[in-house]
Design a protein with these regions (language model features):
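Bacterial N-terminal signal peptides
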Residues: 1-6
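Short, low-complexity N-terminal intrinsically disordered segments enriched in polar/charged residues
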Residues: 10-63, 160-168
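Short beta-strand edge/turn micro-motifs at domain boundaries
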Residues: 13-18, 22, 131-159
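Glycine-rich beta-strand-turn "strand-cap" elements at beta-sheet edges
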Residues: 14-16, 99-106, 151-157, 165-168
């Protein structure tokens, strides 16, 4: 979810607040199977990134995937994303929660969107937090796996207050 905060070298690490935050079809009977699949992909993607950092982030992209971030050129292709996603989970932690997801009628493409929050430290060791919105477009590959076709993020303005945060 996601390419977040790409203006810094720590962009893109995503981790859900909790895998249990995915919709529960036993509680919400309106959740469609396609949405459940997308939320499951998000949870697995986030868990992998939380454990392995930028290497995992890049692994989830399609060969022709695109990462879009604030104020920087698009990063096009998995090879370029691998070269730019060099952070570790120890240097940057980012949590995100998908708010919604929609599977296309063909069942081979869908998107999720939500809110993210990233945590790192500046050169002086002071905590730095970024937050914003993201969208991830997922595409089923010819081998049946799902990969990120496009990931884009937009940071919230520093003085956004509660305008851009999801209610609890």
């Amino acid at each position: 979810m996601p390419l977040i905060g790409m203006a810094s070298p720590l962009y893109g690490q995503l981790e859900p607040s909790s895998p249990s935050e995915s919709p529960n079809p036993l509680v919400d009977t309106t959740v469609k199977p396609g949405k459940m699949l997308l939320f499951d992909l998000e949870a697995r993607f986030a868990k992998d990134v939380a454990q392995r950092g930028g290497a995992a982030f890049a692994d989830w992209f399609a060969e022709d995937g695109v990462a879009l971030g604030n104020g920087v050129a698009p990063v096009v292709g998995r090879v370029a994303i691998v070269k730019s996603a060099t952070w570790t989970p120890q240097s940057y932690q980012l949590t995100w929660t998908p708010t919604d997801g929609v599977m296309g009628p063909s069942g081979d493409i869908g998107y999720t969107w939500g809110h993210f929050e990233g945590h790192s430290k500046d050169a002086a060791g002071n905590p730095v937090t970024t937050s914003g919105r993201y969208i991830t477009i997922w595409r089923k590959q010819p081998d049946g796996t799902w990969k990120v076709a496009l990931d884009a993020g937009a940071n919230e303005p520093a003085a956004a207050g509660d305008c851009c945060k999801l209610p609890n």
